[in-house]
Amino acid sequence: MNRQESAPRALFTPRQGQYLAFIHAYTLVNGRAPAHADIQRFFRLTPPTVHQMLLTLEKAGLISRQPGQPRSLVVLVEHGELPRLDPPDFNQSNSL
Protein backbone atom coordinates (compact mmCIF):
# COMPACT_ATOMS: atom_id res chain seq x y z
CA MET A 1 0.00 0.00 0.00
CA ASN A 2 1.54 3.33 -0.99
CA ARG A 3 0.98 6.64 0.77
CA GLN A 4 -1.91 7.63 -1.48
CA GLU A 5 -3.73 4.39 -0.66
CA SER A 6 -3.39 4.74 3.12
CA ALA A 7 -6.39 5.10 5.38
CA PRO A 8 -8.24 8.39 4.98
CA ARG A 9 -7.03 11.14 7.26
CA ALA A 10 -9.45 13.23 9.30
CA LEU A 11 -10.16 16.54 7.63
CA PHE A 12 -9.96 18.46 10.88
CA THR A 13 -9.47 18.05 14.60
CA PRO A 14 -12.46 17.93 16.96
CA ARG A 15 -11.69 21.49 18.12
CA GLN A 16 -11.41 22.76 14.53
CA GLY A 17 -14.70 21.01 13.79
CA GLN A 18 -16.36 23.04 16.53
CA TYR A 19 -15.04 26.28 15.07
CA LEU A 20 -16.25 25.27 11.61
CA ALA A 21 -19.66 24.23 12.98
CA PHE A 22 -19.99 27.58 14.76
CA ILE A 23 -19.13 29.58 11.62
CA HIS A 24 -21.61 27.49 9.61
CA ALA A 25 -24.43 27.74 12.19
CA TYR A 26 -23.90 31.46 12.77
CA THR A 27 -24.04 32.10 9.02
CA LEU A 28 -27.29 30.12 8.66
CA VAL A 29 -28.99 31.86 11.59
CA ASN A 30 -27.80 35.41 10.89
CA GLY A 31 -27.49 35.44 7.11
CA ARG A 32 -23.87 36.54 7.31
CA ALA A 33 -20.59 35.16 8.60
CA PRO A 34 -19.53 35.85 12.19
CA ALA A 35 -17.15 38.65 13.03
CA HIS A 36 -14.00 37.81 14.97
CA ALA A 37 -15.70 39.28 18.07
CA ASP A 38 -18.61 36.81 17.70
CA ILE A 39 -16.18 33.87 17.70
CA GLN A 40 -14.31 35.38 20.66
CA ARG A 41 -17.52 35.69 22.67
CA PHE A 42 -18.84 32.20 21.91
CA PHE A 43 -15.60 30.36 22.66
CA ARG A 44 -14.25 32.93 25.18
CA LEU A 45 -11.03 33.32 23.23
CA THR A 46 -8.58 36.20 22.96
CA PRO A 47 -8.29 38.13 19.67
CA PRO A 48 -4.85 36.62 18.88
CA THR A 49 -6.19 33.10 19.46
CA VAL A 50 -9.11 33.67 17.07
CA HIS A 51 -6.75 35.17 14.49
CA GLN A 52 -4.38 32.19 14.69
CA MET A 53 -7.24 29.72 14.56
CA LEU A 54 -8.63 31.32 11.40
CA LEU A 55 -5.18 31.31 9.79
CA THR A 56 -4.83 27.61 10.61
CA LEU A 57 -8.25 26.77 9.16
CA GLU A 58 -7.49 28.78 6.04
CA LYS A 59 -4.07 27.14 5.52
CA ALA A 60 -5.74 23.73 5.86
CA GLY A 61 -8.24 24.67 3.13
CA LEU A 62 -11.19 24.42 5.51
CA ILE A 63 -12.32 28.04 5.17
CA SER A 64 -11.80 30.92 2.79
CA ARG A 65 -11.86 34.60 3.64
CA GLN A 66 -11.08 37.93 2.07
CA PRO A 67 -8.38 39.74 4.07
CA GLY A 68 -9.47 43.22 5.04
CA GLN A 69 -13.13 42.43 4.36
CA PRO A 70 -15.17 41.82 7.53
CA ARG A 71 -17.52 38.84 7.80
CA SER A 72 -16.10 37.15 4.72
CA LEU A 73 -15.59 33.69 6.25
CA VAL A 74 -16.85 30.78 4.14
CA VAL A 75 -16.72 27.18 5.35
CA LEU A 76 -15.37 24.94 2.57
CA VAL A 77 -16.39 21.68 4.25
CA GLU A 78 -19.68 20.04 3.27
CA HIS A 79 -22.41 20.58 5.86
CA GLY A 80 -22.84 16.82 6.32
CA GLU A 81 -19.18 16.46 7.32
CA LEU A 82 -19.42 19.04 10.11
CA PRO A 83 -19.91 17.90 13.69
CA ARG A 84 -22.83 18.98 15.84
CA LEU A 85 -22.04 22.29 17.54
CA ASP A 86 -21.61 21.67 21.24
CA PRO A 87 -21.69 24.31 23.97
CA PRO A 88 -18.10 25.31 24.69
CA ASP A 89 -16.46 23.56 27.64
CA PHE A 90 -14.63 26.33 29.47
CA ASN A 91 -12.79 23.85 31.68
CA GLN A 92 -10.75 22.62 28.71
CA SER A 93 -8.07 24.39 26.69
CA ASN A 94 -9.42 26.26 23.65
CA SER A 95 -6.31 25.81 21.54
CA LEU A 96 -6.19 24.18 18.14
Explain the meaning of each model-derived region.
Residues 10-16, 35, 66-90:
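Short, cationic-aromatic polyanion-contact patches
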Residues 61:
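Glycine-centered, phosphate/nucleic-acid-interacting loop/turn motifs that mediate DNA/RNA or nucleotide
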Residues 33-43:
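A short alpha-helical element within helix-turn-helix/winged-helix DNA-binding domains
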